[in-house]
């Protein structure tokens, strides 16, 4: 659906980004995403997605505090009426699964509740922080995602920064920005404040295709 004048004004800061434009914004408004995270890691990335104009966002949260999540959904509706934020129902197939893994509890919950469809953006919020871009579900996520499901270590102060980097990658995929969507794995170096790509080791496991 073409953007209205009000929407052009609302999203003008991102529409003018080279290779973004109105078409990418229309894709964002028509997209559906599942956001998996603990309550403490949820609000800032969610506000970023809503502010950018992602059309439908389903929250997948381990904690069952309905009042808190209901209040958060109302807050996001006030932030941007173009976005619909809901929780408790994952009936429709999303365009993207976005997971912020801050603890083993979130991993277990995601494995049980989240739809196993691609593409996906998965971020580890402990140390060392990692972000994986998965265009399709790997045959064996433990091997293919480079340790994303290894034992969790100490939570670091850069967890929020990792979440913001991952949110940017999610928006690039949803908006089909440039070459977004290619499989990749990054490790965050907090001392140098950079995200370094991790080379594909080409390893195979028993469940991988030949």
Give each language-model segment a name.
Residues 1-210:
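Adenine nucleotide-associated cytosolic modules
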């Amino acid at each position: 659906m073409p953007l209205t004048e009000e929407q052009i004004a609302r999203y003008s800061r991102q529409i003018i980004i080279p290779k973004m434009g109105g078409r990418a914004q229309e894709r964002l408004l028509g997209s559906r995403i599942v956001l998996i995270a603990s309550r403490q890691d949820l609000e800032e990335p969610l506000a970023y997605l809503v502010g950018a104009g992602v059309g439908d966002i389903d929250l997948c949260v381990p904690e069952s505090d309905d009042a808190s999540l209901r209040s958060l959904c109302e807050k996001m509706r006030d932030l941007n009426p173009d976005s619909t934020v809901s929780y408790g129902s994952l009936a429709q197939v999303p365009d993207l699964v976005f997971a912020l893994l801050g603890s083993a509890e979130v991993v277990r919950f995601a494995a049980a509740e989240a739809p196993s469809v691609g593409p996906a953006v998965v971020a580890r919020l402990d140390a060392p922080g990692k972000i994986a871009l998965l265009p399709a579900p790997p045959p064996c996520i433990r091997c293919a995602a480079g340790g994303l499901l290894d034992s969790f270590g100490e939570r670091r102060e850069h967890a929020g920064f990792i979440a913001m980097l991952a949110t940017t990658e999610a928006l690039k995929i949803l908006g089909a920005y440039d070459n977004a969507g290619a499989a990749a794995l990054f490790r965050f170096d907090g001392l140098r404040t950079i995200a370094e790509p991790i080379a594909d080791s080409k390893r195979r496991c028993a469940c991988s295709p030949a």
